[in-house]
Amino acid sequence: MKNAVYDAFPGVRRRGPITSKRVALTFDDGPDHMTERYLDALDELRVPATFFLVGGRAASRPDLVREYRRRGHQIAGHGYDHKRFNKLGRRELLEQCARTETALGGQLSGRPWVRPPHGSLDASSLVYLVAAGYTVAMWSLDSRDYGTTNPDDLVHECAGMSAGDVVLFHEGQQWTLDALPRIVAALHASGLECVTMHDLFAR
């Protein structure tokens, strides 16, 4: 689906207000063997983030689910089995989301957020999610950390960050960790502040 459709559809959040001087860093696909290193890096940089967790992985690591929240980050769902949402019928799609909420063990607050694995949405799956009360989280800037192992490439992709951007990263990759200090330094030099997605879109 095109970004213009997301921007016009109630219940979808892709880019925050450009007047806010804030951006949201988001990380998909955790928890995994590198989660604590990501959390330590964000602690050092003193920035909060939003983590979209795979329910099946979260169910096996409730300690890490709690740790994200303890360190001040927002957590949200990313499907239970990382299946493409646009390939699922209504029942299976909502079951994926409900099972993930259960795996997150009461660490959610307010209306639940969800990000479709691979950004895989069509009109039907989008309607199902919004009608069920989910806030659908997309992104406005893709770091493309899945297509390189060079931190310099990520820094280059993120050089155009501006107010309101929601930036897509992934857990489990050393090059993403290596690039983060430079990316955060650049956004601070531009007068931007890192916040969670919840705070970026708070009214």
Q: Residue ranges of each PLM-predicted region?
A:
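Catalytic domains of cell-wall/extracellular-matrix polysaccharide-remodeling enzymes
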Residues: A59-S60, K83-R203
